[in-house]
């Protein structure tokens, strides 16, 4: 085997590899001889088929198999000989494969960069800590009470905010009834904003038995394109009005929600508020850590990984319509520069965390994958079971989670063992403002 290194610079390794014709012919002959003992051809006894007949029938496929094995063997030999850390599949170019000539080809291999882990103990970050107070808990209790109001008391008085109204209605555009504009026995709580803007307000002051004309304009983003932005009139008949029975927040109320007492329900809500903030805090902390890591990393990255990450980034942009805000009014050049910068950051940090996990011998446990699946499921409220079933029935999808799961594990290890964390306390209102500002800042990074 002849090996000529054509390029060994940065993350590119190119070599020209050749194998003498005699070695190729020897391999082919050996394969054909082996086949004479195995194949069955009409007119010949088993194991007695002449090589010439086998070659005539199987020669092309045997040669192709031999060439493929030789190429794979040669490439693997080069990788081991030069101790290459490769990424992706080597590319084979300029293949010389004529039957009367030596086998020759050029292999182009993309290399992983040498990643040096910086001194992470020099990094210092603030860690937000939510202090849940009694007011936060009472607000949650009041919201729960509002959601479980009982509307059993019929009212003959004028409709006011908070009443539940039962209506029939027919919608008209330019005095013509439109499809989907008929409402029958619809129950709506005034002030809930369940209907299109201003509809509910125009019912205030009416009584049971009244007929009211309600004039509205459908929002520009209304789900029906035929109605979006159009003015309409609804002829509404008030069929019934019910006022809410006051909800007493006590131990009996708590028992409706699997709590033995009101105090137990309060404790549950306090923990829930804290847990809900933790995921958002962890996401922000992770991005803040990445901000610091980005300043410490300057190694080259494989072009294929960079291109792959840019494509993912563009897909995320399209999916989330971020181009309407973040990239609005940007020139094509500025957008390209933005994609390049963010993709480079992501790839560098991903390679660093992979190297860090390797250096600390971090191994994935089943619970690590379960956490990632739970995080994905929380992004689809009401469809959690569908997400769980998808991953349960698709092992290949689970494979795709191993990278993010190991990255999360490495990040948590860094938080727990490397960097300096300074706890900074926030009230619920303060934390919500902080998280909102941070989420806008870290969009698409």
Curated annotation (Swiss-Prot):
Source domain of life: Bacteria
Gene3D superfamilies from the UniProt entry: 3.10.50.40, Trigger factor ribosome-binding domain (3.30.70.1050), Trigger factor, C-terminal domain (1.10.3120.10)
InterPro entries according to UniProt: PPIase_dom_sf, PPIase_FKBP_dom, Trig_fac, Trigger_fac_C, Trigger_fac_C_sf, Trigger_fac_ribosome-bd_bac, Trigger_fac_ribosome-bd_sf, Trigger_fact/SurA_dom_sf
Keywords: Cell cycle, Cell division, Chaperone, Cytoplasm, Isomerase, Rotamase
Coiled coil residues, start to end: none
Class of enzymatic activity (EC top level): isomerase
This protein's record includes keyword RNA-binding: no
EC number: 5.2.1.8
PPIase FKBP-type domain: residues covered: 162-247
GO cellular component: cytoplasm
KW Ribonucleoprotein (keyword) present: no
Catalytic activity: [protein]-peptidylproline (omega=180) = [protein]-peptidylproline (omega=0)
Subcellular location: Cytoplasm
Gene Ontology terms describing biological process: 'de novo' cotranslational protein folding; cell division; chaperone-mediated protein folding; protein transport; protein unfolding
Alphabetical list of HAMAP family matching this protein: Trigger_factor_Tig (MF_00303)
Domain text: Consists of 3 domains; the N-terminus binds the ribosome, the middle domain has PPIase activity, while the C-terminus has intrinsic chaperone activity on its own.
Function per UniProt: Involved in protein export. Acts as a chaperone by maintaining the newly synthesized protein in an open conformation. Functions as a peptidyl-prolyl cis-trans isomerase.
Homology family: Belongs to the FKBP-type PPIase family. Tig subfamily.
Protein name stated in the entry: Trigger factor
């Amino acid at each position: 085997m002849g090996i000529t290194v054509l390029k060994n610079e940065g993350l590119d390794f190119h070599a020209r590899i050749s194998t003498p014709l005699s070695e190729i012919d020897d391999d082919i002959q050996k394969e054909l001889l082996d086949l004479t003992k195995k194949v069955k051809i009409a007119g010949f006894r088993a194991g007695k088929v002449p090589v010439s007949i086998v070659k005539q029938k199987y020669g092309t496929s045997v040669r192709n198999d031999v060439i493929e094995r030789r190429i794979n063997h040669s490439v693997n030999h080069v990788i081991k000989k030069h101790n290459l850390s490769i990424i992706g599949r080597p590319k084979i170019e300029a293949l010389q494969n004529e039957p009367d000539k030596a086998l020759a080809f050029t292999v182009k291999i993309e290399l992983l960069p040498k990643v040096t882990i910086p001194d992470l103990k020099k990094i210092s970050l603030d860690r937000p800590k939510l202090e849940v107070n009694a007011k936060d808990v009472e607000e949650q209790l009041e919201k729960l009470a509002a959601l479980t109001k009982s509307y059993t008391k019929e009212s003959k008085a004028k409709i006011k905010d908070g009443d539940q109204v039962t209506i029939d209605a027919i919608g008209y555009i330019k005095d013509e009834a439109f499809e989907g504009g008929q409402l029958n026995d619809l129950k709506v709580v005034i002030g809930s904003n369940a209907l299109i803007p201003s509809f509910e307000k125009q019912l205030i002051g009416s009584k049971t038995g009244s007929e009211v004309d309600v004039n509205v304009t459908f929002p520009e983003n209304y789900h029906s394109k035929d109605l979006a932005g159009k003015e309409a009139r609804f002829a509404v008949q008030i069929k019934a009005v019910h006022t809410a029975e006051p909800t007493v927040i006590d131990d009996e109320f708590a028992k409706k929600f699997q709590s033995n007492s009101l105090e137990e329900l309060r404790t549950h809500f306090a923990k829930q508020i804290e847990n809900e903030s933790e995921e958002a805090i962890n996401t922000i902390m992770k991005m803040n850590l990445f901000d610091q890591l980005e300043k410490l990393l300057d190694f080259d990255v494989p072009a294929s990984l960079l291109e792959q990450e840019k494509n993912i980034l563009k897909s995320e942009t399209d999916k989330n319509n971020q181009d309407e805000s973040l990239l609005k009014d940007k020139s094509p050049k500025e957008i390209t520069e933005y994609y390049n910068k963010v993709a480079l950051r992501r790839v560098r940090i991903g390679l660093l965390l992979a190297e860090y996990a390797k250096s600390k011998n971090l191994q994935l446990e089943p619970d690590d994958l379960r956490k990632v699946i739970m995080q994905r499921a929380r992004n689809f409220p009401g469809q959690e079971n569908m997400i769980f079933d998808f991953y349960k029935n698709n092992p290949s999808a689970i494979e795709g989670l191993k990278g993010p799961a190991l990255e999360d594990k490495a990040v948590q290890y860094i938080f727990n063992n490397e960097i300096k964390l300074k706890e900074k306390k926030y009230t619920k209102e303060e934390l919500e403002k902080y998280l909102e500002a941070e989420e806008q800042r870290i969009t698409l990074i």
